[in-house]
Amino acid sequence: MRSEESTMTAGRITVYGSCVARDVAGEMERRGWSVERYIARQSLISAGCPADVGDVDLSLLRSSFARRSFLSDMVGNLEAQLTAVASYTDLLLWDLTDERLGVLETSPGTFLTRSTEALTAGLYEGLPARFLELGTAEHLHLWRPALLRFHALLERLDLAKRTILINVPWATRTTSGMSTVPSWGQTAMEANWVMTRYIELVYQETDLRILQVPDELVVADDAHRWGAAPFHYAGSLYSWVADELEISLAPRSLAPAL
């Protein structure tokens, strides 16, 4: 049984994606919503495709969040995680930023999502794996059927109508008027050009709702708590997204309390 306190929130959120969706959820928490689960660093391609990583030293990952995310991605447990929270999720927030670094094919048909934490820790050094870069024909060829499987999963769990993809481009400028710095070799313009193809696939292949953030709000925050990056935005963006989500969901039928 879930506690009485948890059933009295404005609504319950599951996050699948990066800090982009999580920071929006953080804004909504301040408005009385609760975050039930945060599923991060797991590409649609690696979901359901457990990877063999051998004797990787997980102690190299400094945070429990990074270790937990790596292990979840390693076993590809997106379906299990969504199944566990589907009945009490009012809103599934999704963004594609964690797709940006591509995937590693550790053996034929098994994949691992590249993450900043694992790259920084040198976790992939010595790992026999093939890199599939975002935006390449091979990556897109794998991502499209993975998207269809994801959509079918959402339909099966009755989550499709409760899912919203946040489509926000990387910022090219900061709150101080400076140009944003590249992230792992990707500039904002490069990343935005590549990511457009993936957003278009969601439009074309599914009926999931997509929330497009206005360009004038796409400004990176020089003082963001996670540091400087083209996808760490000023607070006004998160407030706008939260406003739009609450408008679009009201009146809404919340998931039944357990």
PLM feature spans:
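Substrate-gating cap/lid alpha-helix
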Residues: 173-212
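Acidic carboxylate-rich catalytic motifs and surrounding loops in phosphoryl-/glycosyl-chemistry enzymes
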Residues: 165-169, 207-224, 256-258
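Histidine-centered active-site loop/cap adjacent to the catalytic His
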Residues: 225-258
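A structural motif corresponding to the C-terminal end of an alpha-helix
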Residues: 85-88, 145-165, 197-211
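Well-ordered, non-membrane alpha-helical segments in soluble/globular domains
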Residues: 75-79, 136-152, 185-200, 235-236
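A basic- and aromatic-enriched beta-loop-alpha substructure that forms the phosphate/nucleotide-
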Residues: 57-132
